[in-house]
Regions:
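Catalytic active-site module of serine/aspartate enzymes centered on a nucleophile-bearing elbow/loop
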Residues: 259-263, 267-305
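Conserved alpha/beta-hydrolase
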Residues: 54-82
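N-terminal cap/lid segment of alpha/beta-hydrolase-fold proteins
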Residues: 1-27
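Short, surface-exposed "cap/lid" segments of acyl-processing enzymes
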Residues: 27, 32-62
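Accessory cap/linker subdomain of secreted extracellular hydrolases
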Residues: 142-208, 212-215
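Short beta-strand/loop motif that positions the catalytic acidic residue
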Residues: 221, 227-229
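Alpha/beta-hydrolase active-site loop
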Residues: 88-109
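Primarily recognizes the serine-hydrolase "nucleophile elbow" in alpha/beta-hydrolase
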Residues: 106-161
């Protein structure tokens, strides 16, 4: 199959947002917009120093083989979208949702696609849910490794479940309480071990995220939804995804037996094998991930026709 990969832009706050359009040359085809997860994750699914799984690039390439185009993007203020805003940290989660609207419009204008699906991975799932509230042009949602509970309870459970966190647990829970109440925490009050999670420059974004209940957002959504969850995900457990389906029983759910959080094939319960997958771009996506997304997009696109 002949494919085309090109740079694509969408209007940003003052400067442009940039991404990569990968498409099979098959005429009118569905397009999937891939919304990245948290932090400095780039359009390919990588981040400096620790995350080199190339999940979004691999997903785009596999979807292209299935006759589905994709756009994978850099967030405002980062990488190719660095000129979109002066400070990449000066954002709230609704800003990313607004960028999804801009991307959907740009994709439709560039490709003429009759259906644009929004795939949100991890934190990107929350962004996708927020964007879908106000966009008639989004055909449906694909929520991948996306938590179905508010972030506060998820973080508390993660902190409390690890005995190694005992020395910093009280400080962490106190910080969370303050942020949920809308109060910033100064650096002097944050244990150095916790600083990467609660940096003062990130707190505005974190506070915006803590206010959102993803299951409540999905409960009101009437378009097609696919929930993709890996059984070997160390960051978003299966029980974290289940509230999404309970909130919207019409949503489809694909449980992928060997997929971890970055959708890589992890054959055992070994922690080191799982973590090693985060830095291995040569490791394939887990069986069933692309198949589930492709089947959902094609079937739902036919139903829209």
């Amino acid at each position: 199959m002949h494919t085309t990969q090109t740079e694509i832009e969408a209007p940003g706050p003052p400067g442009p947002l940039k991404g990569t359009l990968l498409s099979p040359d098959t005429g009118d085809m569905p397009v999937v917009l891939i919304v990245p997860g948290s932090g400095a994750t780039d359009r390919n699914g990588n981040a400096p120093s620790w995350l080199q799984a190339s999940t979004y690039r691999l997903l785009a390439e596999r979807l292209c083989e299935e006759g589905i185009a994709s756009v994978r993007i850099d967030k405002r203020g980062m990488y190719g979208s660095a000129s979109a805003i002066p400070d990449a940290n000066d954002v709230v989660i609704d800003d990313y949702a607004a960028d999804v609207h801009s991307w959907v419009a740009a994709i439709r204008a560039r490709t003429g696609a009759s259906s644009v699906w929004v795939l949100g991975h991890s934190e990107g799932g929350l962004v996708a849910l927020l964007a879908a509230r106000q966009s008639a042009d989004i055909a449906g949602l694909i929520l991948v490794a996306a938590a179905g509970r508010p972030l506060g309870p998820v973080l508390r459970q993660q902190l409390q479940s690890n005995p190694a966190n005992a020395p910093i647990l009280d400080n962490a829970l106190s910080i969370l309480d303050s942020l949920e109440a809308g109060d910033r925490v100064d650096a002097a009050s944050i244990d150095p071990v916790l600083m990467p999670a609660f940096r003062p420059q990130d707190q505005r974004f974190l506070m915006s995220e803590l206010t959102i209940d993803p299951a409540a957002l999905l409960a009101d959504y009437t378009k097609p939804v696919l929930i993709v969850q890996g059984a070997r995900d160390l960051q978003v457990a299966v029980q974290d995804a289940e509230p999404l389906q309970r909130a919207n029983p019409q949503a489809e759910m694909a449980l992928i037996a060997d997929a971890n959080h970055v959708l890589k094939a992890v054959r055992t319960a070994d922690l080191q094998e799982n973590l090693a997958a985060y830095s291995n771009p040569d490791l394939p996506l887990a069986d069933g991930v692309v198949e589930a997304i492709s089947a959902f997009v094609h079937a739902s696109s036919l139903n829209r026709a």
